[in-house]
Amino acid sequence: MKLIKKIMISALFVLGFNSYNVSANAECGDITIANMNWASANFMAEVDKVILEEGFGCNVELIPGATMPTFTSMQEKGEPDVAPEFWANAAIVELEAAVKEGKLHSINKAPITGLGEGWWVLPATLEKHPDLTSADAILARPDLFPHPEDPSKGGFHICPPGWNCELSNRNHFRAWEMEKKGWAIVETGSAAGLDGSIAKAAERGENWCGYYWSPTSLVGKYNLQAVDMGEYAGKDNWDNCLSKPEQECANPKKSSWVKSEVFTVVSDNYKSTAGKAGMNYFKKRTYPGEVMNGMLVYMADQQADGADAAIEFLVRYPEVWSKWVPKSTADKIRKGIGL
């Protein structure tokens, strides 16, 4: 009889505990998060999942996505609820329209610090040649960056065929009159080819100059240094010339790279149902660039996926993520991941 009573009490305890969990989950609700198809976005989605589930009691589902398909789905269907790392340059006009209509909301316009595109060099180059402080100074020294196929010219590494940045870099090459200054384009052929050219130069102690972007594991691993390209020459020059095919850009002007607009975007449904705490989390959730690049290096070196990297980040950087949530929520997260 006592055994039966104990079993009944245990069952009631379990039912009560489960009811509490259901209640907590119901308060937060079901949330869908875009799991974009590049490393930093995958990592961010997994961190969001852990924090929302362990800290806020949400039910989180990650939805595979990419920039434009995810944007279209959020705009037309209101799903997924959250795009953690949305590179808005690809659809800035459409996003602004969706925000104006109240369908979407850009609630964090700096989810990662120090990100962007442009020209980069290796730190060893600047240590040996501290005078190379700008694009003009670098372009005056093609001899320091010999082209792999013609060492008499400087080698300027650009994006693989088919990438939008290939067009921009070819037009930049003309705008800066690089051929007259003794430079030639290095056709990298693929993402692996571009990455390999950087790794090879870094490991051999050679100089390298070309296009790249952050956050990426290579920027973190080799501490690539962004080149000062001067002033931005305006939206018309960028939108209607530099970003177009060469035949549509008759008179390109020198310019810094267009500012990368990267937001955390949420659906109107999420904004209406998430509650103040959930919205505040995404508004505060900003990764320092060096931390993000470091986590991408970890993912590359350890062949870790976003889920593994999320736990590693939460263990390694509590001083970063604990600022995004109330202390009581941070305590729940620590307990949930076994800290």
What are these regions (language model features)?
Residues 72-74, 80-87, 157-238:
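Ligand-binding pocket segment of bilobal, Venus flytrap-like solute-binding proteins
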